[in-house]
Amino acid sequence: IMEVSPRGGGCKIAELQRLAFGVDLIENEVRAAVGMPLVDVRQTECDGHWCEFVIHARPGQSGVFKRMEIDEDIRSKYVKVVDMTTKEGDMVHPFTGANMSLGDMFLRFDSREEMDAVMARSNEWLRIILE
């Protein structure tokens, strides 16, 4: 076991595991912390191939955030969660570390090959619009 905490590894790993495996480690951590019985934690089959995509400005790109655009075909087929921490009007700088992310999203695919192919083209289907 690498981690059992809801934040131990960061990058929303526990949230992604809940979507992929249907097991809520965060709920169990809270239950354990307050002395409640745990909900069944079991090994289940993964529902597809999942990834977290950290959203950030492209190298050299900076300005005032206006919006993010995702190709509608990609959004409808693969994107399951989008969590933006940046809002319209915020200043955006090129990505240099985790504190520069604009948000993140979880995507689900039917195969590893499909995931690799779509993610390799992220610069084609994801646009950060700055003023």
Label each PLM-derived region with a short phrase.
Residues 19, 67-74, 120-124:
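Short intrinsically disordered coil segments
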